[in-house]
C-alpha cells in the first residue's frame, strides 16, 4: 500500500526513506531508516507520514513510519483507517496536523505507540489531545516493543525489516540524489 501511494524510496545502502507530508499532501521531509541508523532529512519538517485514506474516521498514531506500515499490514489495511507516524518526535507541526485530524467529526484517535516509556508519553499526549478536541480515543499497544517486531513474529522472520529490505524497492522509488 505504501508503494502504491508513492510514499517510499530506497536510499543509500538499501535504506528506507518514508515520505512525510503536510495537510495538503506536499512532501516536506523523509524519515530515513537503515540497518544501523535512523534519521530525518536535513531541512525536512516532521509533520506526519500518512498511509491510507486521508478522510478515514480512525487515525492510528505511531512513532515511526515502519510501525505505521506494520500496523496497517497486521490489520489488513483497514479502509476506515489512516495510519500516521510522527517520526519519533513531536514537533509543533506534528501537533497542529494531529489536532486537525482529531477535530474532524466522528474521529477515533488511536494511540498506537510503542510499548515502552517513550510510547506511553506519546500515548498520554494523544489522550489529552482527544479530550481537548472532543474526539473518541483508544490505546492500542503492541505485545512486542513495537508493531514491526509483532509483524516479523507473525510472519515467522527472525530479522527486522531493515535487514532484508536492501534492494526491495524498485529503482524508480529511490530518493532523489544530489
List the predicted regions and their residue ranges:
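Conserved Rossmann-like nucleotide-cofactor binding loop
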Residues: 67
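TOPRIM fold recognition
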Residues: 73-178
Amino acid at each position: 500500500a505504501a508503494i502504491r501511494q508513492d510514499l517510499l524510496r530506497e536510499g543509500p545502502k538499501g535504506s528506507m526513506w518514508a515520505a512525510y507530508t503536510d495537510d495538503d499532501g506536499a512532501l516536506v521531509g523523509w524519515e530515513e531508516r537503515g540497518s544501523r541508523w535512523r534519521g530525518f532529512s536535513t531541512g525536512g519538517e516532521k509533520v506526519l507520514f500518512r498511509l491510507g485514506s486521508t478522510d478515514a474516521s480512525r487515525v492510528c498514531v505511531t512513532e515511526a513510519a515502519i510501525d505505521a506500515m506494520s500496523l496497517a499490514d497486521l490489520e489488513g489495511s483497514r479502509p476506515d483507517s489512516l495510519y500516521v507516524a510522527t517520526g519519533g518526535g513531536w514537533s509543533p507541526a506534528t501537533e497542529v496536523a494531529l489536532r486537525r485530524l482529531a477535530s474532524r467529526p466522528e474521529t477515533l484517535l488511536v494511540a498506537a505507540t510503542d510499548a515502552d516509556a517513550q510510547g506511553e508519553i506519546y500515548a498520554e499526549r494523544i489522550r489529552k489531545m482527544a479530550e481537548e478536541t472532543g474526539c473518541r480515543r483508544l490505546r492500542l499497544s503492541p505485545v512486542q516493543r513495537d508493531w514491526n517486531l509483532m509483524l516479523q513474529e507473525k510472519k515467522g522472520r527472525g530479522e527486522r525489516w531493515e535487514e532484508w529490505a536492501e534492494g526491495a524497492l524498485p529503482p524508480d522509488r529511490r530518493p532523489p540524489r544530489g
